[in-house]
UniProtKB/Swiss-Prot annotation:
It is an enzyme of class 1 (oxidoreductase). One of its GO terms (molecular function) is glutamate dehydrogenase (NADP+) activity. Keywords: NADP, Oxidoreductase. This is NADP-specific glutamate dehydrogenase. It comes from Fusarium fujikuroi (Bakanae and foot rot disease fungus). The keyword NADP applies. One of its GO terms (cellular component) is cytosol. It comes from the Eukaryota.
Length: 451
């Protein structure tokens, strides 16, 4: 890929997958899969467009919009829209590439894609966000559809933005269809969708705890990063299951519980209310049981923890922070964010897993541990196609089953293709990457995408 412009985030995601495949027996047993990897690494389609809109003062503003339709072998392209000033093609290609294999692990018929714009919703009025969403959908509507490409939300795109985008699509297309997921409950949304990524992450970790003979969440100290949708609902589910959440964070710093303290459900709800208004964690009011650490992530400040769940953004756990978690006695790290750990951090975790046997820290990659969000998006698509709405229990039960299947797929594939010593925990990063890749590669081969 040396003749291409530098795309560090995408190259990291590609490197993680390629490394997992190379360091297993897969290519020895199936050398033809090297061809599949070369083909799968190139998006089927990249759409880039300008978005022109007016701010509240009547001034013209322009942003870049994107949709990467990476792989449609398993179903319609599926993946979120991100509105954030950092958005560029490399980040969206990385997210879209990860999405292909994450969606494969859900067992649902969904391809992989990702999109967004370098628009910053922070500090914008409701009217400005509405006008931007309408302008963005003017172009995007030409490229999506319920059987073609079904976007969802991501950073900067919540229920309000999905509503504006869906309304604009409906006007342009003159039809109602399940073209977006994350919709409101009264107009085609699914119960459990807002909670799905956070809940699914916790369900996945429950299977890890059980397999590693580490009990349940009861009495466990859990470090979380982020304070958005994923972190909020993961925290609430952990507390419900008897665990203690001892940290949250945002782009300005980390909020860490003092000795003997942890977050309550009421405090999590208060933080959620702040985040809806795009307010920082610095505005959160408490009685002194938390320490605010400016400009920091929580990992080196949380003290002894059992479980760490990075749930903010990519590359939020460095090599040094990974070592700090090992030293703090953590025995599970599972990503709620996409590619939450740097490659060097993963090396630390994997080296510990190989060295310490059953007592090791066990790491789970986001494409497996956070696939609950897109899984329930897929369930929303299924409900839309039938014009029905399942109960909360029906959706939650299906989510638990999907997370179990994703865990088992990674576990069993690792046991099949990755050499391990007696008593060593299987490599979930290798197993999940290989399991997702095989499913996509076989579908592509059947459809003539490689031969």
């Amino acid at each position: 890929m040396s003749h291409l412009p530098q795309e560090p985030e995408f190259e990291q995601a590609y490197g993680e997958l390629a490394s997992a495949l190379e360091n297993s027996s897969l290519f020895n047993e199936h050398p033809e899969y090297r061809t599949a990897l070369a083909v799968a690494a190139i998006p089927e389609r990249v759409i880039q467009f300008r978005v022109v809109w007016n701010d509240d003062k009547g001034n013209l503003q322009v942003n870049r919009g994107y949709r990467v339709q990476f792989n449609g072998a398993l179903g319609p392209y599926k993946g979120g829209l991100r509105f954030h000033p950092s958005v560029n093609l490399s980040i969206l290609k990385f997210l879209g590439f990860e999405q292909i294999f994450k969606n494969a692990l859900t067992g649902l018929n969904m391809g992989g894609g990702k999109g967004g714009a370098d628009f910053d919703p922070k500090g914008k009025s409701d009217a400005e966000i509405r006008r931007f969403c309408q302008a963005f959908m003017t172009e995007l509507s030409k490229h999506i559809g319920a059987e073609t490409d079904v976007p969802a939300g991501d950073i900067g795109v919540g229920g309000r933005e999905i509503g504006y985008l869906f309304g604009a699509y409906r006007k342009f297309a003159n039809r109602w269809e399940g073209v977006l997921t994350g919709k409101g409950l009264s107009w085609g949304g699914s119960l459990i969708r807002p909670e799905a990524t956070g809940y699914g992450l916790v369900y996945y970790v429950e299977y890890m705890l059980k397999h590693a003979n580490r009990g349940t969440f009861e009495g466990k100290r859990v470090a979380l990063s982020g304070s958005g949708n994923v972190a909020q609902y993961a925290a609430l589910k952990i507390i419900e299951l008897g665990g203690s959440v001892v940290s949250l964070s945002d782009s300005k710093g980390a909020l860490v519980a003092k000795e003997g303290s942890s977050f309550t459900p009421e405090q999590i709800h208060n933080i959620a209310a702040l985040k809806i208004k795009h307010q920082a964690l610095t505005t959160f009011e408490h009685d002194g049981q938390f320490t605010w650490i400016e400009g920091a992530r929580p990992w080196v400040h949380v003290g002894k923890v059992d479980i760490a769940l990075p749930s903010a953004t990519q590359n939020e756990v460095s090599k040094e922070e990974a070592q700090a978690l090992v030293d703090a006695g953590a025995f599970i790290v599972a990503e709620g964010s996409n590619m939450g750990c740097t490659a060097e951090a993963i090396d630390v975790f994997e080296a510990h897993r190989k060295e310490k046997g059953a007592e090791a820290l066990w790491y789970a990659p986001g494409k497996a541990s956070n696939c609950g969000g897109v899984a329930v998006s897929g369930l929303e698509m299924a409900q839309n196609s039938q014009r029905i709405q399942w109960t909360e229990k029906e959706v939650d039960d299906r989510l638990k089953a999907i997370m179990k299947d994703a865990f088992v797929a990674g576990l069993e594939t690792a046991q099949k293709y990755v050499e391990a010593k007696e008593g060593e925990l299987p490599s979930l990063i290798a197993g999940s990457n290989i399991a997702g890749f095989i499913k996509v590669a076989e579908a592509m081969h059947d459809q003539g995408d490689w031969f």
